[in-house]
């Protein structure tokens, strides 16, 4: 059990049979009446966002989420298959479960798979990945003076905005949180 006074961003709680992650919280002490905690919660399974108010000191069950490091071994149809390198257990996830993270996963990449009991919830990607540019417009001499950007398709199929001097075959570093170009590798 966790007290509403101990809520912080990233804390996971069980509410109405689901796992919710605290995104924001605000401890409010009105001049009249008792204090309360106003929270913004995100459902880990569905992504639904909920505003919820708790009395100060109210206790709720804390979710026990286990992180297992797994390797993306292959893609079967639309499903991504991950394997635990210690137990050789497999976990299969749909692109809907992965959200935007599916655009950055390549074979043999290690990720943290989040489990609630035996149920796979989601994955945690590294903050940046190295991807090879497979398609982009060719750079022309003198393009760098304007400091513009152009779209590029990387090996996973994701479209990334890159500087004009990037060409096909180059390896670039991409931020998995927002899909931005971080630099050459």
Curated annotation (Swiss-Prot):
Signal peptide: none annotated. Keywords: Cytoplasm, Elongation factor, Protein biosynthesis. The keyword RNA-binding does not apply. One of its GO terms (biological process) is peptide biosynthetic process. It is found in: Cytoplasm. One of its GO terms (molecular function) is translation elongation factor activity. InterPro entries: Elong-fact-P_C, NA-bd_OB-fold, Rib_uL2_dom2, Transl_elong_fac_P/YeiP, Transl_elong_KOW-like, Transl_elong_P/YeiP_cen, Transl_elong_P/YeiP_CS, Transl_elongation_fac_P. GO terms for cellular component: cytoplasm. SUPFAM superfamilies: Nucleic acid-binding proteins, Translation proteins SH3-like domain. Pathway: Protein biosynthesis; polypeptide chain elongation. Involved in peptide bond synthesis. Stimulates efficient translation and peptide-bond synthesis on native or reconstituted 70S ribosomes in vitro. Probably functions indirectly by altering the affinity of the ribosome for aminoacyl-tRNA, thus increasing their reactivity as acceptors for peptidyl transferase. Belongs to the elongation factor P family. PANTHER family: ELONGATION FACTOR P, ELONGATION FACTOR P (EF-P) FAMILY PROTEIN. This is Elongation factor P.
